[in-house]
Amino acid sequence: MILTGRWVLCIGSPETHRNSVFEAKGFRYVTHNKSLKGFYWATYLLFSRLPRSFLMAAKPTLLPALICSLVVSVSQYGFAAEVPEGFQVIFNGTDLTGWHGMPHFDPRDLAKMTPENRTKKIAEWTEDAKQHWSVENEELVNDGHGAYLATDGEYTDYELLIDYKTVALADSGIYLKANPQVQIWDYTEEAKFNIGADKGSGGLWNNSPGAAGKDPSELADKPFGEWNSFRIRQIGARTSVWLNGKHVVDNAIMENYFDRENPLFAKGPICLQTHGGEIRWRNIYLREIPAEEADKILTESHADGFESKFNGTDLTGWSGASDNYEVVDGAIRCKASHGGILHTTDEYANFVVRLEFNVPPSGNNGLAIRTDGKGDAAYAAMCELQVLDSEHQNYAKLDARQYHGSAYGMAAAKRGFLRPANTWNFQEVTVDGSKIKVELNGNIILNTDLATVTEYLANSPHPGKSRPSGFFGFAGHNDPVSFRNISIKRLPDTPAP
């Protein structure tokens, strides 16, 4: 509904009219009504930009023609249709609310600042950004200069929808968790063919040479002057990119540009880069991905060759301390005040295991790798990968090699990627020769060669670390830790170089 001092134009159901107007100084004004969608929303946007004097002077007979002309204008201005289900609008089409300036800057340095200095620095960047960013016709426009634009919100697992349009010779990108970047550039610029411009936009360009995702799988850019559409999904560091409907990056790890020895930051803002040429953005929506959906995506990605090892009903296919474990709600759970090793009946040399686990507050368990089912898995097996509620106060003073994901007593995993207690987590473990890699919720937290380890916790020997094969299992430590969706993929007996 559009109201002026004289005319009322109904463009939706009565429900959409609520809170559509307010009165001030004798005039009625259209206000932002988030319930207006599609054609109604576009018409509202267009009418709200017409001079009030024009609307007040308009005759009823002119309004139908006016509406027709506005409908035609919708396609020219590119106003968004309905917000996709489950997504939130993170650019309001009017101003820079929800965004701040931020150049290419190591987020760790920002985090080290005092709150006062951090606020001051962001304010400086934002003032710079305001000189180069503007809003035109619901489009976010940058002139090719100034600070980047970053969301005020920070995100962990999410899906981003965003359209862009740029010009020849421009170079831009989208930083994810403040980390560069999903690349945008001129795919016709021959001077940059040597660094991959001819392959097109959408790749994780700052990944190491040869790394998965560095280059897009195909050229998907539209010609200059046309809008391009990105769909970007990130779970931990696992990143997928669709450009104009083409899947150009498939669940690749985005490397931490600022510290390649560490995983990508656990959370961070989305940043729109400016790099020497005008670029326009519109239709920016974001959906945070819940843990259960994130785990399902990670489980189903590149799942060829995996064999389920748990039927969800009983302990068929498992041996060892079976009296100390139970099946509850489709998961294997260690009984409280019980322990021991529950292991597969099959042996494995090199393999990948995927599973989900749930740790109660202060809970402790472990993954027994190449175990013989006897003794203490931390020493008698190749290793015990710690399963622990690491952030519980009981464990504040542990050795770094005792926290979750660590090869117990030998190699420390990175911290900060475990979900809260009583929440399911996804974990993938790759065992290849003496090398072992642990990926937690899409983040690689351990990647080491145990053959190179020479220092041990408390100088305790680990005679089992050179075992070439054995069972896979769970090393219970008296806490009701649960495991489900367990699958294993065999790898060639000869380790990869």
Describe the predicted segments one by one.
Residues R6, R18, R28, R49-R52:
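Basic polycationic patches enriched in arginine
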Residues F39, L46-A65:
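Bacterial N-terminal signal peptides that target proteins for export
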Residues V30-T31, A42-T43:
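Intrinsically disordered, low-complexity segments enriched in serine/proline and basic residues
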